[in-house]
Structure formats: C-alpha cells, structure tokens
Amino acid sequence: PILLDGDTGYGDFNNMRRLVRKLEQRDIAGVCIEDKLFPKTNSFIQGERQELEDVQTFCGKIQAGKDAQHDDDFCIVARVEALIAGWGLDEALRRGEAYREAGADAVLIHSKQSRPDEILAFAREWANRCPLVIVPTKYYATPTEVFREHGISLVIWANHLVRASITAMQATARSIFETESLVDVEGRVATVAEIFRLQGADELLE
C-alpha cells in the first residue's frame, strides 16, 4: 500500500475533495495531511514560528476528504504539528481528538526532539483511541520495540532513501572527478537495463 504525503491538502476543502478522488483513481491507499497553513514549510525549518490551521477548518478538510472517497479502505491520516510549533502536549491531544472525531482514520504526531519523550507521552495519553503514526527522523536511535510497547501502529522512515541516494551520488561524482574514469564506479551503480526495468520500458532494450 502507498500512503501519499499530501502536505496540507494543497488548499481548502475543495482541493482536498479533488485530491482524494484523484488518488483513488491511481489506487493510492491513503493520504496524510498536516494542520499547517498552505503553502507549508518543512517542520524542521523554524517549526516554532509556523502557524497552524484553525482546528475546525482542518476538520472540514478531513470531512470533505472522507465524503469524497468511494473506496471504503482509503485512509486519511491527520498529522498534528502542535509539538513542532511549541504549543504543547495538551494542544496536541486536543487537535488529535478533534481530527479523530472528524473522521481521520489515523493520527500522526510529529516531533523535532532527539529523544522520544514527548511522543511517548502523547501515546500514553492517546491510549489507542485510533491508530497512531510517527516519523522518528530526529529520535532515530529509539528501538522500534519501544514504539510497539506504547501502542504506536505505524512508523514512517520518511527520508532515508533520499538521503542515502545523495550520499551515493556525491561519492560517485567525487570518484569520477578525481580519477577521470568510470572504471571504479561502474560496478557500484545501477545498469541502464535496470533503469528501463523500473520504468516499465524493457522494450527499449530491444
């Protein structure tokens, strides 16, 4: 199943309706939207200065998305940014509960702390009201078993493939620059045939 990162829903409730319909047409399993204002900024860039969406307005987006879906299994995950914005645990819980009541299939609680303390505190208070999702980009050293013990349903490893690809591309570029040759890198990179295979364009090899 594919869960799409839908940012803030790309606008108002009308945009959210259209987004859900388009995703269902492409067999996407669900979408995660966050309660920040459109257009959004990455949560780790001055997160405490970012404004959050009005709760009722965001609930309206969730309801619009649920009303628009035709597939009963399509999921809307509501991402709570209150901890990122420095608004505290109580506000995060208030928002999470409002989003659950509005029809969210799961709630994602996000944090920029290097320890999972505030996430685990949220999980304890949340008490399995609905599935809970996390993104441990900053508190990556926490064992997955800790998340299981606190009733967390889904862990998203959000950006590590992108970051790994950057490291690999930098190393490849450095090698080519320093050796003025492809000999040292050819065995460490994907073949052209593999690229065609991933694109579903194997006929280009004929």
Where are these regions (language model features)?
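Active-site loops and adjacent core secondary-structure elements that bind or stabilize anionic groups
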Residues: 156
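Extended, intrinsically disordered, low-complexity segments
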Residues: 160-206
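Alpha/beta enzyme core
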Residues: 1-153, 164-170, 174, 204
